[in-house]
Amino acid sequence: MATNYHDITIAFAGVCQAVSLVQQFAHKGSADREIFANSIKSLLVTQPDSTLAVFDGQLANLKLGLETVQAQMGSPNGKLDTEIGRYWINVLALSQKLNKNPEAKAKLAERLQQIERQLPLYENDIMADQMIANLAAIYSDVISPLGSKIHVLGLQDYLVRPDIQQKIRASLLAGIRAGILWQQVGGTRWQFLFSRRKILNQTQQFYKSI
């Protein structure tokens, strides 16, 4: 069966967009609201018709992620931006642990269904502060116990703020969702060693089409 780099790249861009948001919140205390929303909304797309449907069918919704993939896969001598690189590697590792843990997967699905039921209370706005706090709690309760915690670097003034902590955890949860998608469409870590150029080429094609 041929490797589907089209879908693998979309899913990986979703991971990279989420961890780029983590970095921005940690270092700047803010991130583009629309980009953040594109990642957060993906958490409620549980039965997509296609891989891109997870991101509302628009490659433009993954612009930051595609930029990040290009920087990661296209850097000289394959050298990664160590901070972003560490984040996506850890997110993929956690998503793989989640995939092997039926109990945690069931708990995650149940908690996300609760989020959907709560949405009408907040005018169906997944970006409402309480919704972000609830998503952050899911990350803490379901994902964090699966393995080593992801150590987020940034400015202490931002990292101590509860609202920033919640946005970081919600972004990481979106990254985990994209990591699960990445596995479902055939993503493996070996591809980063042996098929780096294919991922980069596909990313560049996507980016040019935006």
Curated annotation (Swiss-Prot):
Q: What's a Pfam family this protein contains?
A: DUF489
Q: What is the lineage of its organism?
A: Bacteria, Pseudomonadati, Pseudomonadota, Gammaproteobacteria, Pasteurellales
At the top level, the lineage of the source is Bacteria
Q: Where is the signal peptide?
A: none
Family of this protein: Belongs to the HflD family.
Statement: the UniProt record of this protein carries the keyword Coiled coil: yes
Q: Which UniProt keywords apply?
A: Cell inner membrane, Cell membrane, Coiled coil, Cytoplasm, Membrane
- The primary site where this protein sits is cytoplasm
Q: Topology in the membrane?
A: Peripheral membrane protein
Q: Which is a Gene Ontology cellular component entry for this protein?
A: cytoplasm
Protein's UniProt name = High frequency lysogenization protein HflD homolog
**Compartments reported by the entry:** Cytoplasm; Cell inner membrane
Coiled coil location: 103-130
